[in-house]
């Protein structure tokens, strides 16, 4: 198998934000289904570090995939200005918002090879439906057919990930802090993340099934590398029909259910204890309030008696004077 020029693509958050902004701006003025731009970055051995990007005017015919337009002059002028700011950032490939590969991507990639021999295509999904990375990286390779027909250009998938420098990480943390919903509890958030993860897994399994069905019906050629990788995945799956696996699963499930039951029981006892304490506190408060009222009445009665005694004394003094 031919060794690829790049084995991993690292996309920075700044690139993702720029692409989303590009898509939102174009979406307001036109009806384009996708936008196209240029990726800037640097190579570190077989790892491509994509640190910046800029948009490029692009248009295509919805009915005829062979009809498309990309502004070369704009691309060269923008790259010249970016090069003055940071000479280390070079053209390393291009992006579009997909969300899937298009038939004319090979032709566009051949054009981008004028500026970068090992041009990399990164598809950035600006509206992801499932949990996971919004990026898919590809590099063009020569595909050799088993039937002896001439080779053709095709895309080979490359591993991609999101990476950032320290300054970018701080900015992303601030953004996440602003949009994070503090009212959502930890448990519900964990369950939501698991549900999203299962939905993502389900979509991947559906893609695998669809691919295998198309290969079986002859709609797609057999790619032995993909078949071998799928076989490795299937070999890693546990045999759920084994008695030992079933027993271990039941034991673990029972242990978890016991923990849940004990937690619910403890929660009920604590709630009952709090209810009793609250009732006692209310009773003491009512008793104290009643005692204070009685003391207040008694004090007022004593004050009246003292005033009466004083008035009687004054009357007697007046009589004696007379």
Curated annotation (Swiss-Prot):
Residues 281-322 are annotated as: Disordered. Residues 9-144 form the MPN domain. Keywords: Acetylation, Isopeptide bond, Proteasome, Ubl conjugation. One of its GO terms (molecular function) is metallopeptidase activity. The keyword tRNA processing does not apply. Does not bind a metal ion. Component of the 26S proteasome, a multiprotein complex involved in the ATP-dependent degradation of ubiquitinated proteins. This complex plays a key role in the maintenance of protein homeostasis by removing misfolded or damaged proteins, which could impair cellular functions, and by removing proteins whose functions are no longer required. Therefore, the proteasome participates in numerous cellular processes, including cell cycle progression, apoptosis, or DNA damage repair. This is 26S proteasome non-ATPase regulatory subunit 7. It comes from Bos taurus.
């Amino acid at each position: 198998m031919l060794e690829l020029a790049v084995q991993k693509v690292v996309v920075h958050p700044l690139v993702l934000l720029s692409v989303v902004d590009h898509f939102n701006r174009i979406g307001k003025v036109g009806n384009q289904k996708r936008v196209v731009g240029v990726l800037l970055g640097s190579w570190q051995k077989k790892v491509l570090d994509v640190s910046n990007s800029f948009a490029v005017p692009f248009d295509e015919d919805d009915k005829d995939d062979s009809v498309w337009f990309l502004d070369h002059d704009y691309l060269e002028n923008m790259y010249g200005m970016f090069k003055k700011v940071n000479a280390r950032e070079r053209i390393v490939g291009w992006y579009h918002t997909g969300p899937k590969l298009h038939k004319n991507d090979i032709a566009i990639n051949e054009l981008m090879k004028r500026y970068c021999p090992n041009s990399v295509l990164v598809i950035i999904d600006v509206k992801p439906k499932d949990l996971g990375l919004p990026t898919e990286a590809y590099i063009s390779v020569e595909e050799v057919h088993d039937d002896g027909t001439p080779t053709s250009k095709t895309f080979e998938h490359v591993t991609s990930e999101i990476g950032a420098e320290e300054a970018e990480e701080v900015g992303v943390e601030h953004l996440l802090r602003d949009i994070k919903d503090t009212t959502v509890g930890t448990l519900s958030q964990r369950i939501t993340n698991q549900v999203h993860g299962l939905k993502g897994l389900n979509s991947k399994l559906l893609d695998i099934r669809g691919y295998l069905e198309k290969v079986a019906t002859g709609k797609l050629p057999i790619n032995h590398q993909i078949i071998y990788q799928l076989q490795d995945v299937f070999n890693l799956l546990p045999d759920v029909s084994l008695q030992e696996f079933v027993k271990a699963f039941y034991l673990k499930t029972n242990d978890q259910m016991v923990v849940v039951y004990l937690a619910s029981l403890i929660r009920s006892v604590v709630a009952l204890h709090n209810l009793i304490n609250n009732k006692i506190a209310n009773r003491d408060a009512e008793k104290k309030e009643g005692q204070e009222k009685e003391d207040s009445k008694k004090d007022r009665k004593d004050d009246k008696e003292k005033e009466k005694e004083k008035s009687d004394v004054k009357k007697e003094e007046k009589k004696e004077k007379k």
